[in-house]
Swiss-Prot record:
It catalyses: N(6)-[(R)-lipoyl]-L-lysyl-[glycine-cleavage complex H protein] + glycine + H(+) = N(6)-[(R)-S(8)-aminomethyldihydrolipoyl]-L-lysyl-[glycine-cleavage complex H protein] + CO2. One of its GO terms (biological process) is glycine decarboxylation via glycine cleavage system. The lineage of its organism: Bacteria, Bacillati, Bacillota, Bacilli, Bacillales. The glycine cleavage system is composed of four proteins: P, T, L and H. In this organism, the P 'protein' is a heterodimer of two subunits. SUPFAM superfamilies: PLP-dependent transferases. The gene is gcvPA. It comes from Geobacillus thermodenitrificans (strain NG80-2). This is Probable glycine dehydrogenase (decarboxylating) subunit 1.
Amino acid sequence: MLHRYLPMTEEDKQEMLKTIGVASIDELFADIPEQVRFRGELNVKRAKSEPELWKELSALADKNANARQYVSFLGAGVYDHYIPAVVDHVLMRSEFYTAYTPYQPEISQGELQAIFEFQTMVCELTGMDVANSSMYDGGTALAEAVLLSAAHTKRRKVLISNAVHPQYREVVRTYANGQRLEVKEIPYNGGVTDLEVLAAEMGDDVACVVIQYPNFFGQIEPLKAIEPLVHEKKSLFVVASNPLALGVLTPPGEFGADIVVGDMQPFGIPMQFGGPHCGYFAVKAPLMRKIPGRLVGQTTDEEGRRGFVLTLQAREQHIRRDKATSNICSNQALNALAASVALSALGKRGVKEMATMNMQKAHYAKSELQKRGLLSPFAGPFFNEFVIRLNQPVDDVNARLRQKGIIGGYNLGFDYPELANHMLVAVTELRTKEEIDRFVNELGDGHA
């Protein structure tokens, strides 16, 4: 070989030239004018050995502030959670790692069963009847829920809370624009959706109402009070939810939600600089035939053996083409598998304990910050995120925290001008009391 990363020998080169009927490289490129050809050595660095390459790439990677080297209090949709070691071991099995959409069930039973288990666990978490095999992420899952609602109700207006993740709202608007849907935002009041404004906006032209639970500020929305406002007008109730929070909160399905979506990143999926992650999509039974994406069902073969197959395929783009419920294809099957393995490793009790730890540690952090004079503009129950008001720009505070080995919270001023100098703080089960106290002291000592 001429180079270890370019596995071509001189014999290989001559064989290829002979096959195409030319005698040399110069003859191959004879149609390129001489005056534009480059002669000489390219001004590039010499090739590195493998140890040298590892050292250089590691140095480049270390420039990033990551959760292995820093203590992270940054959330806003992507969280630093515990990932059981077994997750990567299962993911790296070649039959999962390289698998595509399992159109041939007779040779894909392992993949199909894994997807079926994912769907089952999503239904158990959300309190819904049917879940699909995954979506790209939480934002696209929410956008697909809006499209389903418009198609089902044959209405064009969408009401979405301003307390829904700002990036989710942008994705919804992008999808809605192509379908000529009207998207109207409902303001928040006290950190949760303003129910008086929502009630005033409800009408016979509303396809759906979109609420996040917990919402972007970490607050717990009053789904029980919202549901009758929505269904009184025969609109659909769409809830975007952090699946980990459902380990301690009442599932949206028990509050009458018609569609529940979200991102499975808290279970077994690294932060990965924002993606790829894995969306989930669950519905009540009447909407089953309009759900986007793959559905795996359990059946028995002619010999009475249990088996798994893709079901209700007539909805999908490989059959219906332009009339399909959506054009999502392979989805995020590998990340869905990661979530399934993590959930299986934790078990029901483990998920509840993990969610409880998130909630308890977040409440401890907020309480300690309030003792130092760093108050929250919002009262009411919250899960593992909360908002605090600073006396300095959030970016300045975060720059100081990074010098101390801490990744601070999200700058809410980016998306909410009225919340300039407000930080969204996330506290997960991985944060220790010592780390939380250190974070509190750094903010307090700096008179943030």
